Amino acid sequence: GHATDLYCQAYFVYDSKKSGGLTQSHLRFGHSPIRSPYLVSAADFVACHTPSYVHKYDMAKNLKEGGTFLLNCGWDLDGLEKNLPASMKRTLARKHAKFYTIDAISIARKLGLGSRTNTILQAAFFTLTGVIPIDQAVTEMKDAIYKTYYKKKGQEVVDMNNASIDHGINELVEVQIPDAWLNAQGTPVENHNPAFIQDVVEVMNRQEGDVLPVSTMVKYGLEDGTWPAGTTKFEKRGAAVEVPVWNAAKCIQCNQCALVCPHAAIRPILLDESEETKKPAGFETVPAKGLKQYTYRMQVSPYDCTGCGSCVNVCLAKDCALEMKPLDSQLKEAPNWTFAVEEVEIKKDAVSAKNVKASQFAKPYFEFSGACAGCGETPYIKLVTQLFGDRMYITNASGCSSAYGGSTPSSPYCTDKKGFGPAWAMSLFEDNAEYAYGYLLGQEAVKRQLAAHVEALAEAGVAPDVCRAYLENANNAETSREASDALLDALENNGSEDAEFIRQNKEFLTKKSVWAFGGDGWAYDIGYGGLDHVLASGKDINVLVLDTEVYSNTGGQSSKSTAAAAIAKFAAGGKETKKKDLGLMAMSYGYVYVAQVAMGADPAQTLK
């Protein structure tokens, strides 16, 4: 702003993904004050920084006649012909657009900048828009880079970023739009997703949710605020620049990569003989170690991976069994993923909570969330759902975990093929523990009523052995599911009021695992009073505190969990007092079990 006399205005629109989501920047520049309290609908310049967006959004819709369109991609003209939707080709041609491409992803990788393409694309922006003279823009950008990085990172990092500016200017490619694009015709793509996903979720993910009528919400029973589980598996964002590729010959089958994956996008798969005969071409498997009846494969979902590289970093194989490769080269793995999760059954005899490897053969009931690439919180949530997910009640405090855990229309908590999975809800920041307590007390009240009806049936001689077996196992986490199923089977043809009540409330038959999730801002500070009350109750309730030692979701303010002298982004002066010992305070009751865990330090202790 200081480099020009122009007035400027900026509006930003974004989704609730913590990273890898959509951000729209609406910029205006002019010689007089700008008084336009609305978004840009006729733009001189439109840039698309993520190639996959051309298939998700109408990227050229708001481009002016004769405007400039910049696409960050690695496609030449043949690649553009193959990959651009017909509708976008027609729009660019009919608006006589000036069309440019730049492969910022490859440039960043070549310069050692990883996936950071922002400086490259900023240089391209100044080159194409002429908001300020390009020489002045380069000088200003390089001065800013020096001030930002020289003292903290050194001259090498400064040089890398300076080079990215030069490449952003020099490697722009102007595309001559073929005349044939005026009447481009595409091949219709069949959408096999459920009606709810097509009618509601996909519309909202296209940022068009404001056009949905109330009648659509009523049609799908959403008027009470409930939302179907497991919608994230239909998003297939393709947000990664690179994704891991599994080398079967080097793999030691430790499953550590699956444990640390923040998005459940890499999973160990076990196949029996029947499934082996049905596997698609290219679905390489090897004999499973310690499980001779099965074959083994580590499967990656390229469209759901965010490319963080945590799996590569944790690999215990001598020569590393995972290698990061460009996303485009691995899209062929998508059908393999579909086969692995849809056609291959979870092998219950291989699942165990006794060791890390066996725990990862369990289904994660938390997948493909909007958490940041490499998130350190979500692996813990995912692991908890692998252990207890089919019978969990979860309440969530405000914070990162609520943003990636349940921001409409994305629901990462999912169900298995039988329809079992976590029930998730969020109330206020300050009453999350009390909310979980209410969950517990409410389902206990219903269970007492159920027990009375089951007892009445037993006394009436209706399947007395089955009824008493249920009563004996109703609060046993390991056996209540089996006892509940047996009870429902025995009462299938019974028309009594007792049996009808049981059928209507069958979801409460099994022993529930009630959890309160939240960060240190909730547990140490804002919600501590309620948390203390619930812990003191002595009730069978669980709490997962995702302790990042700062208020993460709001940018990085210090909390009572922040260590003494620690500097946070918005607390640069350093913490003057020491970290609150929440675990010790809870243990002082004498009947509260506390486990302090760090997956990176000791995965086995974390699991225990």
Residue positions per predicted region:
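Solvent-exposed alpha-helices and their adjacent loops that cap or buttress functional pockets
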Residues: 16-21, 37-41, 61-63, 91-94, ...
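Acidic, Ser/Thr-rich peripheral helices and adjacent loops at domain boundaries
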Residues: 68, 78-93, 334-351, 412-423, ...
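Thiamine diphosphate
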Residues: 344, 404-405, 414, 495-496, ...
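Short internal beta-strands
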Residues: 68-74, 397, 543-547
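Active-site cofactor/cluster-binding pocket
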Residues: 1-206, 275-280, 564-568
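Ferredoxin-type iron-sulfur electron-transfer modules and their immediate structural context
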Residues: 137, 141, 153-305, 312-393, ...
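Short acidic, glycine/serine/threonine-rich loops at helix termini
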Residues: 20-23, 58-59, 80-84, 111-113, ...
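Alpha-helix capping and helix-loop boundary segments enriched in small/acidic/polar residues
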Residues: 34-37, 41, 108-112, 132, ...
